[in-house]
Design a protein with these regions (language model features):
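Intrinsically disordered, low-complexity N-terminal segments that are enriched in acidic
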Residues: 1-90
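Terminal peptide-recognition signature
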Residues: 32, 143, 214
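A short, polar/proline- and glycine-enriched secondary-structure boundary/capping micro-motif
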Residues: 44-45, 92-93, 235-240
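Short intrinsically disordered coil segments
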Residues: 47-52, 96-105, 228-231
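Acidic low-complexity segments
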Residues: 59-69, 73-171
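Active-site nucleophilic cysteine motif
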Residues: 136-143, 173-188
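Hydrophobic/aromatic-rich core segments of domains that either
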Residues: 179-269
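Low-complexity, Gly/Ser/Thr/Pro-rich intrinsically disordered linker/tail segments
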Residues: 248-303
Length: 303
């Protein structure tokens, strides 16, 4: 069972309330989006156990970025939270042992701007990595090797300051988990391999933290995982067996909330999001203005 919450800092709320009172209002109008577990092959038996207050709306389990949504007029600061439970299942895959079908599907192979962009540099890199290879499994493996063996984990500024996170990663050879995942997705799509985004939390008894990873599709097996930042970590540790494990597989300690990058919320957030690409900790809008950074406090723990 996970417990998660989001709220304004007291200082942020005080400033917002003072501005509202200067306009003749005694409350601030707040909209909140908090991530919830979404339906996917690795996640089932999802139960929303409790909320700090009944949400105005709960997005369906199939939403690309699933959230609980609250809308309220606040005279006092408060937090918006949820407790939920789910079953996490790891489906083992051995892509390097499979025989790929001669004809592969073409869904999830298009550009998805601004970050899944087929720039000249990315197209040239994909061509170089897959030159002489016809097997889609080996193409995906070459791309995974490039990311995990060449890109160094590096904390990133908020993604909204980047024009294109994937081209920048391929050139600088630096990125965090989301940048690595998006770079893998972009190169796979250029090579004709269906690939997509998945993200949420790493949820362990002792800790919980944000994480992003990728999925790729090879017929007849179907969707498999590529956790490039975990693979890069194993490469740094000299653990080749585990680096290869994350080409096709995930651990069971994941809470999946998002199945697409840069997807709108349901209902949509009309102001600028703190993270327009992803949603791992939630978003708050106060009187039509989105909050970010130190204006917001979040929690996530295993209970």
């Amino acid at each position: 069972r996970d417990s998660t919450s989001i709220g304004m800092t007291d200082e942020t709320f005080a400033h917002a309330l003072a501005a509202a009172k200067a306009e003749g209002r005694n409350t601030v109008h707040v909209k909140v989006w908090l991530p919830l577990p979404a339906a996917c092959p690795a996640q089932s038996n999802i139960t929303l156990d409790s909320f700090t207050a009944q949400p105005t709306y709960i997005a369906p389990e199939t939403a690309p970025q699933r959230t609980a949504y609250w809308e309220a007029d606040l005279a006092e600061n408060c937090r918006f939270g949820a407790q939920y439970s789910y079953r996490s299942t790891a489906h083992y895959a051995a892509p390097l042992e499979m025989q790929a079908d001669p004809v592969q599907p073409d869904f999830d192979t298009a550009e998805q701007l601004p970050h899944i962009a087929f720039t000249p540099y990315m197209k040239a890199l994909a061509a170089q990595l897959t030159e002489g290879i016809t097997d889609p499994v080996q193409k995906a493996k070459r791309i995974y090797d490039f990311v995990t063996l060449n890109v160094h984990y590096h904390f990133q500024p908020m993604y909204f300051v980047h024009e294109n996170i994937t081209d920048n990663c391929a050139r600088s050879r630096r990125g965090d988990c989301g940048v690595m995942a998006a770079t893998f997705i972009t190169l796979c799509r250029i090579a004709g391999i269906p690939a997509k985004w998945q993200s949420g939390m790493v949820a362990r008894p002792e800790t919980a933290g944000c994480h992003d990873w990728a999925m790729f599709y090879i017929a007849p097996k179907g969707w498999m995982y590529a956790d490039c930042s975990a693979g890069a970590s194993m490469a740094r540790a000299g653990n080749e067996k585990m680096r290869l494990h994350y080409f096709g597989n995930l651990d069971t300690d994941r809470m999946v909330a998002n199945s697409d990058i840069c997807a709108p919320f349901d209902p949509p957030m009309c102001s600028f999001r703190a993270d327009p690409c992803d949603n791992q900790v939630g978003e708050i809008e106060v009187d039509g203005v989105g909050l970010y950074g130190q204006q917001v406090e979040t929690t996530h723990e295993i209970v």
